[in-house]
Amino acid sequence: MTEQTTRAVLGIDIGGTGIKGAPVNIDTGEFLAERHRIETPQPATPEAVGRVIKELVDHFAWTGVIGCTFPAIVHNGMTLSAANVDASWVDAPAQDILATAAGLPLILLNDADAAGLAEVVFGAAKGQSGKTIMITLGTGIGSALIVDGKLITNTEFGHLVFPKNDIAEKYCSGKVKEDSGMKWGEFTERLNQYLLHLQVLFSPDLMIVGGGISKKHEKFIPALKGLRFAVVPADLKNDAGIV
């Protein structure tokens, strides 16, 4: 696979359980080949993750630019936190590490920020004015804040103290539901409380729900109550991080 016939990048999404990638047409957001997924190595050290990035580059015979997302606060190419990956990523020059491993130019962005940006350009928030929040419900809760089409990076709304003396992603993430065997009714109630909290803080105009659990959005979105904004599933489903 090469990028010679169209404007494209290799999109790679690094997650706690899987690292997936696909070449993406940057004008349409469409995949140019079937996505490829590799299990995240354990421990997910910089060296181990770098080897997977190189494996994806080789799989697609890629020679161009890479856009890579990461489950951490990313600032000026540095990862300032480490969610669901090895702690050695904290304060690491992650963009340089991964670019060196790939042997290609690479741009690094927080995973939820990248998903939100993809929804702004190609998906559910395309043309949306005002404040849009995207949350990704997975191993944790990622977030993106878009104001009049502009991304405000590294919001980390999953780490808000909620409901009491804890953080939101320990209360209503996809992993919490799965690990506890929580029924949809209880999960919906917890998510509803969290969204009401975000409503008080930010008064968003639109809420987009992504992450793996968004595949079953009909189980919980219609039951949400008391919100002054629309809640919609991500158009790009669980591939938004790649796009």
Model-assigned labels for residue ranges:
Residues 70:
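Glycine-rich nucleotide/cofactor/substrate-binding loop typically near the N-terminus or early
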Residues 142:
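Histidine-centered metal-chelating micro-motifs
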Residues 106-111:
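General beta-strand structural signal in soluble alpha/beta enzymes
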Residues 79-91:
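A charged helix-plus-loop insertion that forms the helical arch/lid used to bind
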Residues 1-66, 74-78, 96-104, 118-133, ...:
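ATP-binding/phosphotransfer module of carbohydrate and carboxylate kinases, centering on a glycine-rich
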